[in-house]
């Protein structure tokens, strides 16, 4: 399963930063219909925004910042250039600059949910959960089903142990992005925290399906089986972990404990300490 790192969610951010390139491509396609016409995009004098997008896609964030800075100089009231430069700054881990640019983008386009999401991610990476939550809330007022805003707000709700709210947010995420293994896993954790083991196991199974080679998926489901009192299925999952990672000491230890207790007594195994999901939104 892929992990979405707080503050450096560049895979997500590129989906945002690439948005202008789609617009530029459409402009060029229309210009090509007129032979000899000037194909320059009037919304991007000098082509700096388009160049910045390409640099950002290639993770050349310093060059992307330079291009977006020139785009801002040419079009200082175009919010997308501030948004894109903020994304590039995040790629360089220059969060103060990223925050300032997201704020400027919001000032210029207060109904663009993406800038609130980006600024919220910066705040979240700086451990300002309440301020980040306010930005995600605002983004969702504008775009109620934005999966990124829902994903990160769900992470905050998990951190605050507001399990049902987290479930509600991650439900939207998995509906919009069913291949998001991290969202399935986090909703499973929230269900498990409410002692809803059947639902948790079903979600862990969905998470495993997105990446069957990840041993941690089976490990998490094994723990849910243990908490549900099904040591046999827990053992099967731990064996699956060891099939992928034979030297996994944790899985070896847990499996041995299960087998020892099963041989010693027919009573259900006492659950081991709860394992929390990874420390960043996924």
Residue ranges and their predicted role:
Residues 57-58, 91-92, 118, 125-126, ...:
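Register position in tetratricopeptide repeats
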Residues 45-46, 79-80, 113-114, 147-148, ...:
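Helix-start (N-cap) detector for alpha-helical repeat units in TPR-like alpha-solenoids
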Residues 43-77, 87-91, 121, 155:
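Alpha-helical segment of the N-proximal tetratricopeptide repeat
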Residues 74, 108, 142, 176-177, ...:
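Structural marker of alpha-solenoid helical repeat scaffolds
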């Amino acid at each position: 399963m892929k992990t979405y790192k707080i503050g450096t969610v560049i895979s997500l951010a590129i989906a945002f930063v690439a948005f202008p390139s789609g617009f530029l491509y459409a402009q060029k396609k229309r210009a090509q219909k007129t032979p000899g016409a000037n194909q320059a995009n009037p919304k991007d004098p000098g082509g700096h925004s388009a160049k910045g997008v390409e640099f950002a896609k290639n993770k050349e964030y310093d060059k992307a910042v330079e291009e977006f800075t020139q785009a801002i100089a040419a079009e200082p009231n175009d919010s997308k250039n501030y948004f894109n430069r903020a994304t590039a700054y995040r790629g360089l881990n220059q969060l103060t600059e990223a925050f300032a640019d997201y704020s400027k983008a919001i000032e210029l386009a207060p109904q663009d949910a993406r800038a609130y999401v980006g600024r919220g991610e910066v705040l979240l990476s700086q451990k300002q959960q309440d301020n980040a939550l306010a930005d995600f809330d605002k983004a969702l007022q504008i775009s109620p089903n934005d999966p990124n805003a829902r994903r990160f707000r769900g992470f905050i709700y998990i951190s605050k142990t507001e399990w049902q709210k987290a479930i509600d947010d991650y439900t939207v995420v998995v509906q919009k992005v069913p291949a998001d293994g991290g969202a399935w896993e986090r909703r499973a954790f929230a269900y498990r925290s409410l002692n809803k083991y059947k639902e948790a196991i079903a979600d862990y199974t969905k998470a495993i399906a997105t990446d069957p080679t990840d041993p941690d998926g089976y490990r998490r489901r094994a723990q849910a089986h243990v908490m549900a009192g099904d040591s046999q299925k827990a053992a099967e999952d731990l064996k699956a972990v060891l099939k992928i990672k034979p030297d996994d000491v944790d899985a070896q230890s847990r499996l041995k404990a299960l087998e020892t207790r099963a041989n010693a007594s027919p009573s259900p195994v006492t659950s081991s300490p709860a394992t929390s999901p990874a420390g960043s939104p996924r």
